[in-house]
Design a protein with these regions (language model features):
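FIC/Doc superfamily catalytic core
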Residues: 1-136
């Protein structure tokens, strides 16, 4: 990066830090980032719901016609995990434990795969959006 790019980044950072944490603009930005985070996180594993559909599920708790229950549950599980993190771990003193991670995992996939939720995997699971590469 050259100095001009770094200077622009610094200006934007200062403008961002000037926004009051309790302002309407900051609340809207946080809410939008929340929806986008959930949308992109479940999308990595192949969820086909759009950002607008994801937002609608989270805001209304109503199902989207033509989409699977599993896709809905992935979104609701991710939301449950984020609520758990924000309500219990955000102010936790000390390291996050293996048990904390398993509790997050239990919430993320609890409605999708309740048998495996909160446990270590015993099998390899390939990423839905990437081809499997084998060593020759």
């Amino acid at each position: 990066m050259d100095d001009a790019v770094l200077a622009r980044i610094d200006i934007k950072k200062r403008k961002f830090l000037d926004v009051k944490a309790d302002s309407a603009a900051m609340r809207r930005a946080k809410k939008e980032a929340y929806f986008q985070y959930i949308y992109h996180t479940v999308g990595i594993e192949g969820n086909t719901l759009s950002l607008a559909q994801t937002r609608a599920i989270l805001e209304t708790r109503l199902a989207v016609v033509g989409k699977s229950i599993m896709e809905h549950n992935e979104i609701l599980g991710m939301e449950a995990a984020l609520k758990y993190i924000n309500n219990t771990l955000i102010d936790k003193y000390g390291d996050i434990s293996i048990q904390d991670i398993l509790e997050i995992h239990r919430r993320v996939i609890g409605n999708v795969d309740p048998v495996e939720a909160g446990l270590f995997r015993r099998t390899q699971v390939p990423n839905a959006t990437s081809p499997v590469l084998y060593l020759q």
